[in-house]
C-alpha cells in the first residue's frame, strides 16, 4: 500500500513527503504560481538540507523562507503525499509480504537514536503472529508517512496489548492527535515521536497517565513547550529531548506544582546549553538518576549561584543523581571536576572529549580525574575498580608533593582532596633534607616501572622492569630507553598506559619528572617512535 496524492489543495504548514520516498519529509511553505512556469506549484521546505534546490527564491523572486540554501524546492501536487493513517501503516508494515530489502530496513529506533534491528526468525510463523494486531506488544512504523489516526478508528480493540510504539520520522504534528492516540491505547507506555515536526501550540492535551517513556528527539521543541507537556505526564520516568536546540530551561509552573516528580532519566544530548545555571534549575528533581548533557556548550560546573533558584536552602543539589554524562562539551578547569563531588549519589561520570580530559589540549590524565572524584565508579564508560582508585590516588598525591612547596593554603585551594588522600594512604613527606639524603633515602625514592617497546621499526624486544628515581625527567628516561633497548637512529616517544583508559597518554614534556606526570610504582610505559 503506497500513499497516494489527490487533487485536494495543500495548505501552508502541512507536513508532506515525496510520493516516491517516504523518508524525504518536509513542510508546505507556499502554494501558488511560480513566475515563468505554468500551473500551481507547492513550495516545500525539506527537513534535510540538500533535499531541495534553493532557499525559497527562484530567478530572483522570493516566495518563502527556506531553512538553508538547499532545503527548498517547488513540486507538483501529484508528486507529494499527505501521508496515511496509523492503521494503514500497520497493514503496510505487518500484513504485507516483505522483500529482503524491506526486512533489512525493519528496526526499532532506540531513545539514543540507534537502530535496533528486528530479526524475522521463523518466517511465516512470526509473520502470522504479527498480522494478528491484538498480539502486538511493540510496533515500529518509522518513516511510513503516518499523518493521522484515521476516521472512526478504534485502536484500543485493535491493539489492546501494544506497549511500545515507534513513530519516528512521520508526518505527525498535531498534539490533539497524539493525545487521542495515547488515550485509545490503554497498554501504551513508550512512545517515540522523534523527527516529527511537532506543533508549538500545545493545548487540550489529556492526562497521559500511562506514558512512562517519551522520546521527542529532533522535534523542534523548546523547554517552554516541555513545561506545558509535563502537566499531562504525571507518571513520566524517561524523557528524551536530543537535538532540539534547547539553550535555556525556563519554568512556566507555579511553585505549588510538582513537576516531573517521577522523572528518572532526562536526555538533553546534542543541544545548545552553555550556562550551568540552566542545568541547576533541574537540581531539585527528587527522583532524577540519569542526566545526559553530551554535545552541549558547557564550559564550567559549579554548585549554586548565591541563592539562585538552582537549589533550595538546606538541600543537596540533584539528591538522586547517580549518572551524569558531559562528553563533548568545553569543560577545561579542575574546579569544575571538583564541583561534581557535591552531588551526593554521583558515581557514573563522562568527561571525554572535553579539554580537561585531553592532555594534548592542556588537560589531565585519567588518574588525576579518578583521584579528584570522590565517589566515581565509572569514568568515561570504563569501570573504576578498587585497585585503579587506590593507585590513582597515590600517584596523584605523589605528583602534588613533587610540584608544590609546603604551603597548606595553596595546596588546599588547588588540590582539595590532597590532605584527605595523603592521610588515607599513609603517605609520608618525601622531600630529602640535608641530614637524611643518604643512600637509604635515595633507595626508598625509587619507583618500579615497566617499559614496553611498541614501535614498528624496533623489532620484538622483551619488556624491561627498572627501578628509577621519581625525580628523573622524561627527557632523561628517553635517553635511558635508547640505551636499554639499543635503539639506533630511532628517536623514542614515551606514553603512559593507564588502567581503564582506552588510549595511552603521551609524555611530551621532556623537562617534567616522572612524579610530575603521575608515574608511580608499577606504572607501564610504552616506548614508541617519533612519526
Curated annotation (Swiss-Prot):
Belongs to the TBCE family. It is found in: Cytoplasm. Essential tubulin-folding protein involved in the tubulin folding pathway. Not essential for cell viability. Probably involved in the binding of alpha-tubulin in the multimeric supercomplex. Disruption phenotype: Embryo lethality. Embryo development limited to the formation of a few giant cells lacking microtubules but not actin filaments. Failure to localize KNOLLE in mitotic cells. Pfam families: CAP_GLY, LRR_9. It comes from Arabidopsis thaliana. Residues 32-76 form the CAP-Gly domain. LRR repeats lie at residues 84-109, 159-183, 185-213, 233-256, 260-284, 285-308, 318-342, 344-366, 474-497. GO terms for cellular component: chloroplast. This is Tubulin-folding cofactor E. Disulfide bonds: none annotated. Supercomplex made of cofactors A to E. Cofactors A and D function by capturing and stabilizing tubulin in a quasi-native conformation. Cofactor E binds to the cofactor D-tubulin complex; interaction with cofactor C then causes the release of tubulin polypeptides that are committed to the native state. Keywords: Chaperone, Cytoplasm, Leucine-rich repeat, Repeat. Belongs to the PILZ group of genes that disrupt, when mutated, the microtubule cytoskeleton and produce mushroom-shaped ('pilz' in German) embryos. GO terms for biological process: embryo development ending in seed dormancy. CDD domains: Ubl_TBCE. InterPro entries: CAP-Gly_dom_sf, CAP-Gly_domain, Leu-rich_rpt, Leu-rich_rpt_typical-subtyp, LRR_dom_sf, SDS22/Internalin_LRR, Ubiquitin-like_domsf, Ubl_TBCE. Its main location: cytoplasm. SUPFAM superfamilies: Cap-Gly domain, L domain-like, Ubiquitin-like. Signal peptide: none annotated.
Amino acid at each position: 500500500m503506497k500513499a497516494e496524492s489527490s487533487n485536494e489543495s495543500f495548505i501552508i504548514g502541512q507536513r508532506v513527503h515525496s510520493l516516491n520516498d517516504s523518508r524525504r519529509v518536509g513542510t508546505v511553505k507556499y502554494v501558488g504560481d511560480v513566475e515563468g512556469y505554468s500551473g500551481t506549484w507547492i513550495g516545500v521546505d525539506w527537513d534535510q538540507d540538500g533535499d531541495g534546490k534553493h532557499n525559497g527564491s527562484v530567478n530572483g523572486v522570493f516566495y518563502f523562507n527556506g531553512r538553508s540554501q538547499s532545503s527548498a524546492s517547488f513540486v507538483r501536487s501529484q508528486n507529494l503525499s499527505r501521508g496515511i493513517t496509523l492503521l494503514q501503516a500497520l497493514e503496510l508494515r505487518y500484513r504485507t509480504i516483505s522483500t529482503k530489502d524491506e526486512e533489512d530496513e525493519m528496526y526499532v529506533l532506540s531513545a539514543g537514536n540507534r537502530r535496533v534491528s528486528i530479526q524475522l526468525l521463523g518466517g511465516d510463523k512470526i509473520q502470522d503472529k504479527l498480522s494478528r494486531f491484538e498480539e502486538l506488544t511493540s510496533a515500529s512504523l518509522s518513516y511510513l508517512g503516518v499523518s493521522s489516526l484515521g476516521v472512526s478508528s478504534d485502536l484500543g480493540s485493535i491493539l489492546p496489548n501494544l506497549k511500545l510504539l515507534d513513530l519516528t520520522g512521520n508526518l505527525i504534528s498535531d498534539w490533539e492527535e497524539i493525545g487521542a492516540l495515547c488515550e485509545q491505547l490503554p497498554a501504551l507506555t513508550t512512545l517515540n515521536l522523534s523527527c516529527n515536526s511537532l506543533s508549538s501550540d500545545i493545548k487540550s492535551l489529556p492526562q497521559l497517565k500511562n506514558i512512562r517513556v517519551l522520546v521527542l528527539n529532533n522535534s523542534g521543541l523548546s523547554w517552554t513547550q516541555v513545561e506545558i507537556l509535563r502537566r499531562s505526564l504525571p507518571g513520566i520516568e524517561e524523557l528524551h529531548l536530543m537535538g532540539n536546540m534547547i539553550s535555556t530551561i525556563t519554568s512556566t509552573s507555579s511553585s505549588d506544582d510538582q513537576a516531573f516528580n517521577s522523572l528518572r532519566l532526562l536526555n538533553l544530548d546534542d543541544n545548545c546549553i552553555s550556562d550551568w545555571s540552566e542545568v541547576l534549575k533541574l537540581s531539585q528533581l527528587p527522583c532524577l538518576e540519569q542526566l545526559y548533557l553530551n554535545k552541549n556548550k558547557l564550559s564550567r560546573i559549579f554548585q549554586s549561584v548565591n541563592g539562585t533558584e538552582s537549589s533550595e536552602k538546606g538541600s543537596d543539589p540533584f539528591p538522586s543523581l547517580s549518572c551524569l554524562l558531559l562528553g563533548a562539551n568545553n569543560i577545561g578547569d579542575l574546579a569544575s571536576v571538583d564541583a561534581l563531588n557535591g552531588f551526593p549519589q554521583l558515581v557514573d561520570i563522562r568527561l571525554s572529549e572535553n579539554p580537561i580530559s585531553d592532555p594534548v589540549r592542556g588537560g589531565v590524565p585519567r588518574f588525576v580525574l579518578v583521584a579528584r572524584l570522590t565517589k566515581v565508579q565509572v569514568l568515561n564508560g570504563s569501570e573504576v575498580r578498587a585497585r585503579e582508585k587506590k593507585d590513582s590516588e597515590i600517584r596523584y598525591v605523589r605528583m602534588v608533593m613533587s610540584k608544590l612547596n609546603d604551603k597548606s593554603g595553596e595546596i588546599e585551594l588547588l588540590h582539595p582532596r590532597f590532605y584527605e588522600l595523603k592521610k588515607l594512604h599513609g603517605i609520608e613527606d618525601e622531600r630529602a633534607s640535608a641530614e637524611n639524603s643518604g643512600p637509604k633515602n635515595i633507595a626508598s625514592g625509587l619507583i618500579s616501572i615497566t617499559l614496553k617497546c611498541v614501535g614498528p621499526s624496533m623489532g620484538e624486544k622483551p619488556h624491561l622492569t627498572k627501578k628509577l628515581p621519581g625525580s628523573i625527567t622524561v627527557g632523561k628516561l628517553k635517553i635511558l630507553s635508547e640505551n636499554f633497548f639499543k635503539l639506533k637512529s630511532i628517536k623514542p616517544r614515551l606514553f603512559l598506559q593507564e588502567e581503564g583508559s582506552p588510549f595511552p597518554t603521551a609524555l611530551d614534556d621532556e623537562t617534567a619528572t616522572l612524579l610530575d606526570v603521575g608515574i608511580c610504582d608499577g606504572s607501564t610505559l610504552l616506548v614508541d617512535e617519533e612519526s
